[in-house]
UniProtKB/Swiss-Prot annotation:
The gene is rplY. It comes from Endomicrobium trichonymphae. This is Large ribosomal subunit protein bL25. NCBIfam families: bL25_bact_ctc. It comes from the Bacteria. InterPro entries: Rbsml_bL25/Gln-tRNA_synth_N, Ribosomal_bL25/Gln-tRNA_synth, Ribosomal_bL25_b-dom, Ribosomal_bL25_C, Ribosomal_bL25_long, Ribosomal_L25_dom, Ribosomal_uL5_bac-type. It holds the Pfam family Ribosomal_TL5_C. GO terms for molecular function: 5S rRNA binding; structural constituent of ribosome. Residues 211-239 are annotated as: Disordered. Part of the 50S ribosomal subunit; part of the 5S rRNA/L5/L18/L25 subcomplex. Contacts the 5S rRNA. Binds to the 5S rRNA independently of L5 and L18. GO terms for biological process: translation. GO terms for cellular component: cytosolic large ribosomal subunit.
């Protein structure tokens, strides 16, 4: 994972009007939490955060720059506005750079399969991400797989993925990632998603589309609950 710095400022849990004003001023309300850490309400620059996501994707170590120093975190989940798709809330989960964590890493397909190029087959993606375990700095931004040799009826499983230093695949080794099928099979099985390139499974981070429900801070303030930590390789409970 790459490392970036993002300034974070403390904020109070206010009303929906306060949150709307915060967003109009170019800030995104967020929560910083983790195992043994009291959740902190913070705000970050919308412009800087969006540029970080566009340049690095979700798998990036974000060193939140507080007044009392930097704290390492990853993006656990995002809330997006239903109409504009703008990010309106972020969950930052605290991490230790020395402890292993489990995250989803996107799989990148390199080349055009022989069965597609020369025999009219269709590439069908079963999963687009795989779960790995590693210390944060060893987690790759993506995992590349060469599919040029694949013929119709052949595929790639987790067991076929390249070995990476310090990285362990924690999904079942027999999990099928991508395969090449005949066009006839696509119509017989009624899988229009195969023609469109397949569908993704769980994404990292989780994206929540807001349809006008109460903001997360309002719900937390009313319920008086704390934000739980997700499971890592060193223990904890998943959010």
């Amino acid at each position: 994972m790459k490392e970036v710095i993002l300034d974070a400022q403390a904020r109070t849990v206010g009303s929906k009007g306060d949150l709307a004003f915060l967003r109009k001023s170019g800030k995104i309300p967020a929560i910083f939490y983790g195992k043994g850490i009291k959740p902190e309400a913070i705000a970050v620059s919308s412009k800087v955060f969006v540029s970080i996501m566009e340049a690095n994707g979700a798998n990036v170590i974000i060193n939140l720059n507080f007044k009392d120093g930097k704290k390492a975190a990853i993006v656990k989940s995002l809330d997006r506005d239903f109409l504009t798709q703008h990010t309106i809330h972020i969950d930052f989960h605290a991490i230790s750079l020395e402890d292993k964590i489990e995250v989803l890493v996107p799989v990148h397909i390199a080349g055009v399969a022989d069965g597609v190029k020369n025999f009219g087959g269709v590439m069908e993606f079963i999963v687009r991400e795989v779960k790995v375990e590693a210390i944060p700095r060893n987690i790759p931004q993506k995992i590349s797989v060469d599919v040029k040799a694949l013929r119709i009826g052949q595929g790639i499983t987790v067991a076929d993925l390249p070995e990476l230093d310090g990285v362990k695949y924690v999904q079942d080794s027999s999990t099928l990632i991508v395969h090449v099928i005949a066009v006839a099979a696509v119509f017989e099985e009624e899988k229009p998603e195969a023609m469109a390139g397949g569908t993704a499974t769980v994404v990292q981070p989780e994206v929540i589309i807001s349809k006008g429900k109460k903001d997360k801070e309002d719900e937390e303030a009313e319920k008086g609950t704390s934000v739980a930590s997700p499971t890592t390789a060193t223990g904890g409970t998943k959010k």
